[in-house]
Amino acid sequence: MHIWRIARFTLVAALASFVVACGEDAAEPAAPVVVNKSPNDEREYAAVTLDNGLQVLMVSDATTEKSAAALSVGVGAFSDPMDFQGMAHYLEHMLFMGSESFPEPDGYMNFAAENGGSSNAYTSSEITNYMITIENAAFPEALHRLSEFFSAPILDPGYIQKEKNAVNAEWSMRRESEGRSIYRLQRALLGEHPANRFTIGNLDTLADKDTRELHPATIEFFEQYYSANLMALVLISPLPVAEMESLAQQHFSLIPNKEVDEPVVTTEVNFEEVAGKLIRFKPQRDLREMRLSYIIDNNAAEWRSKPGDYLGYVIGSEMPGTPADKLKSMGLISELMTSSYESLYGNYGTFEISVQLTPQGMKRREEIFDVLSGYIELLRREGVDDRYAEEYRQSLDNRFTFLEKIDDFSYAASLAAAMQDYPIEHVIDAPYRFDGFNQEAVDSLLAQLVPERLNVWYISQEEETNSELEFYVGPHAIEDLEARDIEAALALVNRLGLAQPSQNGLLPEAFDLKETPAEVTSIAVAENVTFWLKGSENFDGLPKGFTRLQLSTDKALNSVENFVYLSLWESLYDLKQARLATEASIAGMSLSMSASNGISLTMSGFTDKQPELLARALEGLRVNPSELEFGQAVERYLRRIENSKRAFPYTRFTPLLGMLTREGRYTDASLALAASKANLEEFTQFVETVLTTSHLRAFFFGNYDEADVRAAYTQLEDFVTPSRSAGYARAGIYNPEPGATLMLNREVPVEDLGMLYGFAAPEASIKNQALARILARHLRVRAFETLRTEEQLGYAAGGGSLDLYQHP
């Protein structure tokens, strides 16, 4: 962690300096640190290090309606004692249970809710982060309450069992998650390395031991690591920086500095023991995935050149001639992704290539492996081209130059976390910083992508397993990875014509701002075809915009078969346009299709090249799949239906509520039956019908003018023939009536249960919507305190509001 000391003259500090200056010349104050911020960011930033070593970043924003704070501690699950795994997470829970000045266990959350705010915290491998947002007037008291988490916590033993139960419930809710299970197994392979911890904790790991009990161990952990010199604080409010600094001094200078060394993982692994494995993993859901997971040395210090991201940029490209493009065209995969986690295990990280397999790909996994490993060998021998450096730099620079604001709660949390990783000057720009292609760093990373550091994962329900995973549901088998002929793999790559990707043609070149209407303006682009245009507050002063083109048809609402065909259309479009979507994403734009009461094509981001993006997007509307591609889309759709049943129960509330209250929503059984009978000929006819008989409308928000709107319609005319008579097709919706009750029960094939209990206002009005949101804020806290904390009936307890066409 980097501690940057900045001299600030509060009254006390100034008096101290005066006394010293009476006897000798006063020392020159250190120059203030300048935090590198986006040119689009008008907020004022300042940093200070309190006398106790606590680093503080203050963000003064005159426009913010609420204040926010976050404090990160540079310790996480990797520092858990082995006899109390989950300790860091459990301590995070206990700190919410009251402090000396505010002893009520529910006082902190109640205070936040009563003042229009919210609070949360999380524990990761190497940090623990606490955050709160609050009405501006309540900000000083919020800081007082938050600071006492660390300066005067009660750690009341009366809440040990309840918080252990809460931690246990959190673990239980996630124990069937494949992502959690795979991550746990990844770390279990590391043996004695500190990353091999059960990070959440449960009743067993947090139980009193013969040698010592949980409560004194908790106090010991707090005293050992919760030191001001390991902490970073972020304050965001409309207050001037000087006033925020005074608040920080007043409340957070009381946190003791124990001069603790930053916890650093240094344990080395024996690659002969932890790598060179084939892991067969049998998931709960019907997945078909293969991963190449390389263990790499931590290269987080190379954040200015980002070798992992740069290499992933090349290997994960969808451009012609790349592995993703070729393997998709062969019908073997539906998706390829790369990821680089520089410090996932502390002193080690991972570089991963993950592919989603088709049924045909499942039969040819070794060939796919040869393509991927052969391509890496090709890059190693040829050297990664530096021609992508400029477009990569430009992509990141554009994002930073026109960086958009996010909510202050999330922003404070992200800055507090970044302060643990980067110099204070670069906590904002570090993710966007690219000082140029670093050949040495890229070559060093490529040299680590070798079989000796590789674990290959086969993830499917077809895997034969012989072991169970501790703490999580994870049947698996581990065997030594058979050696493959790299020269044969390289020959295959050359035979397939694989090469390094071509360059991006969608990067914006012009950033001019256009005159946009402040109010919604309707533009009749053709008979019975109206588009709407409005400047957007979200993109105010930015050369960005959001466009949505909608083709609506009642055919999507009155037939389960048509609903399925729309979903298949969306799936096939996303698959076939993955290359374009990836190219657009790199250029700072997004492209997606969604299906509901028709189809919607959505673009957002920089507006300069959106006409080119739209032209290419429209060319792919008629997806024209082969029989094989269509069959694979149906198979993916059926698997998605089945897999949704194994999702966390609370994540299914929204789609089930939609089925209960809206027309054009169907049961899983009816969707599966319709999909099993789908055929390519009917699908092709349906697509043509939608494109030639539907109602067309479009919305343009942001940096557009009327000429842009009309030009977009001209582009559309070559691909779409909208109906001149059809109206917009809107799904019918349940009209709440006093005394009426709707009830839906579903059995789920997972251990956890869920319940949604809702009330609908019979009168549709904006006023009722606003009142419902206020009520939901208080209900959320009451439900959490009563159902989760006091009665221990569940972990994910809360409340919220949603609208059924203005019915809250």
Task: Give the positions of each predicted feature.
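C-terminal motif of bacterial Sec signal peptides marking the signal peptidase cleavage site
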Residues: 18-21
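Scaffold signal of the M16-like zinc-metallopeptidase fold and its non-catalytic homologs
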Residues: 30, 98-99, 142, 149-150, ...
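M16/insulysin-pitrilysin zinc metalloprotease superfamily fold
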Residues: 97-101, 133-166, 347-404, 561-562, ...
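M16/MPP (pitrilysin/insulinase) zinc-metallopeptidase core fold and M16-derived inactive scaffolds
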Residues: 30-31, 68-133, 197-202, 317-336, ...
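Mature N-terminal segment immediately following signal peptide/propeptide cleavage
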Residues: 38-70
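His/Glu-based metal-binding/catalytic segments typifying zinc-dependent metallopeptidases
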Residues: 262-322, 409-430, 460-462, 472, ...
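Bacterial signal peptide processing site
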Residues: 23-25
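Acidic/histidine-enriched alpha-helical segments
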Residues: 109, 154-172, 240, 259-273, ...
